[in-house]
Regions:
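N-terminal accessory regions of nucleic-acid-interacting proteins
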Residues: 297-380
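Short helix/loop capping segments that flank catalytic or ligand/cofactor-binding pockets
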Residues: 21-22, 128, 277-281, 319-320, ...
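Metal-dependent nuclease catalytic cores that hydrolyze phosphodiester bonds in DNA/RNA
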Residues: 1-115, 305-310, 315-343
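Mg2+/Mn2+-dependent nuclease catalytic core
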Residues: 83-226, 382, 388, 392-393, ...
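Polybasic (Lys/Arg-rich)
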Residues: 209-263
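Cysteine-cluster motifs in flexible loop/terminal segments that predominantly coordinate metals
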Residues: 14-19, 239-300
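Activity-critical C-terminal alpha-helical subdomain
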Residues: 471, 478-497
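Short glycine-rich phosphate-binding loop at a beta-alpha junction
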Residues: 452-459
Length: 497
């Protein structure tokens, strides 16, 4: 069986052409199928969903069939219909199937003829902010648009199936202003694989009271969803909600290429694009199919440097003007502007464009700038690299969702005579311990033996140090002032700190 599910609807909104390529997954390569980062993000989502279910106890789970090849939408919907005959009921993964549209809701709470439709997401928010979902410009905040249209689709399908019911849509999100009131909250929800290699979560509590205070926030989004349905909010200027449902349902069921106009942001991050390591393999590139169809590109054109990999290029107007190759660009197209004493953003872009256009493979070195920078270095040179974690369900009492946890660093020294020394390292493997303050104290001891210049592996290290500084300020640890002074001496403030 096939249908337009909510995941397919979401994918189709990103670009309707993607839905055609995912329809034909045996033909087209998809980089997201092998992305470990996305798999890790999904694991956090599974944990939050299980945590959310416990806030609505007594629910009945509509379980997936063990064999995904016999996934029967109608059977799942029939199970849901049977449960809805009860006056009051809580259902996890309720299923609704009508007119080739299929959705499953994370949590459904039925009381008489009123239904709460609750979509659980691991995304965080501060509920006190006034413009979380709709900005001051009266438009949906772009980062929330996929979630809100997903919720609108679920509400729409549920109303089609239950026209006499009142449906209230909610997003259940992580409240980043709340703190865990128990230790080990994250570890109550263990991510595991079943024998069929499907990801699940094992819940390791006997009673909901073990979870402490609820760190989720439930937001009623009836008004926003209604405006999406009415066409007041659109995903694209030329496609309202009902048009999107019709178009994407047709693509899904009829399996045709919609020839949706290529758009810079979607094409730049298209998951159906093959990199050099995948070239020559059996599966085809959906990205190439689009450009051969819409722009009549030949295989030779794909070898020409395009605008899609120009560093930090974000202007969609270039593509709208038909400027797709670096060879077509002029300095005016990227608003070229020099900066005193450093390489500006657009200078950096133009260097890349010129060199690739002219087949110039020599490295660019700002010799004067580099020399001026190196003249400020003090030996020995210190190199630090951090390993950290950030999770929606905190590990420790008093910590907020998505707070940074720094559990490991390595420290190497480059001496003036050329010697490289692996000088220090730290790793905290103590279960249940909050490592951050011990981490930075160890780092202070490692780096306070001389005045050598400190190099961080990336901006990540600076971000972590600032996050720990914020945590220290809110703590009563005896050495807080010394550690804060140390952090301020080796880092620079960020927008959040």
């Amino acid at each position: 069986m096939i249908a337009l599910s909510k995941s397919r609807f979401k994918q189709g909104l990103e670009c309707p052409n993607k839905l055609y390529f995912s329809n034909n997954k045996e033909v087209y390569y998809n980089v997201k199928n092998n992305d470990p980062f996305l798999q890790a993000l999904a694991s956090g989502g599974f944990q939050v969903e299980e945590y959310a279910r416990l806030q609505y106890p007594g629910g009945v789970l509509i379980e997936d069939p063990q064999d995904r090849k016999i996934y029967d939408y109608q059977d799942l919907a029939d199970q849901t219909s049977e449960l809805l005959k009860q006056e009051n009921v809580v259902i996890y993964e309720a299923a609704f199937y009508i007119d080739d549209l299929f959705i499953r809701t994370d949590v459904l709470v039925k009381k008489g003829t009123h239904i709460q439709l609750i979509e659980v997401k691991a995304k965080s928010l501060d509920p006190s902010e006034n413009y979380n979902f709709v900005g001051k410009s009266k438009k949906i905040v772009s980062s929330w648009k996929p979630y809100l249209f997903d919720l609108a689709f679920q509400t729409y399908v549920t109303k089609l199936c239950l026209p006499t019911y009142t449906i209230t849509p909610y997003l259940c999100l992580v409240d980043k202003t709340k703190s865990a009131t128990v230790d080990g909250l994250n570890q109550f929800f263990r991510v595991k694989k079943d024998p069929n290699n499907r990801t699940g979560v094992k819940v390791k509590i006997d009673d909901i009271s073990q979870l402490g205070e609820n760190i989720l926030h439930q937001e009623n989004l009836s008004e926003v969803v209604s405006k999406i349905h009415n066409g007041d909010y659109t995903y694209y200027d030329n496609l309202n909600f009902h048009e999107a449902v019709k178009l994407l349902s047709e693509i899904r069921m009829q399996n045709y290429y919609p020839n949706w106009p290529a758009q810079f942001s979607a094409c730049k991050k298209c998951e159906f694009k093959k990199d050099d390591s995948e070239k020559g393999k059996i599966k085809q590139s959906g990205f190439e199919y689009c450009f051969k169809t819409q722009y009549q590109w030949t295989d030779k054109d794909f070898k020409n440097p395009t605008i899609f990999n120009v560093w930090d290029l974000k202007d969609p107007k270039l593509m709208q003007q038909g400027l797709l190759f670096k060879s077509q660009l002029t300095p005016e197209d990227i608003k070229y502007k020099e900066a005193a004493g450093k390489l500006s953003r657009t200078e950096r872009q133009w260097l890349q464009i010129e060199k690739e256009r002219d087949n110039d493979f020599t490295e660019f070195v700002d010799i004067e700038g580099l020399k001026a920078e190196m003249d400020t270095w003090v030996y020995p040179l210190h190199f630090i690299d951090f390993e950290t974690s950030t999770v929606p369900l905190p590990f420790h009492t008093g910590r907020k969702p998505y707070e940074q946890i720094a559990f490991q660093y390595s420290h190497h020294i480059y001496h003036e005579d050329g010697r490289i020394e692996h000088a220090n390292e730290y790793i905290n493997t103590t279960a249940g311990a909050f490592p951050n303050f011990e981490f930075v104290e160890s780092l202070q001891q490692a780096l306070s033996k001389d005045e050598g210049t400190i190099f961080k592996f990336a901006t990540h290290e600076n971000t972590i140090l600032n996050a720990i500084r914020t945590q220290l300020k809110a703590s009563d640890t005896p050495k807080k002032e010394s550690l804060i002074s140390f952090i301020e001496a080796i880092s620079h403030p960020t927008n959040d700190n």
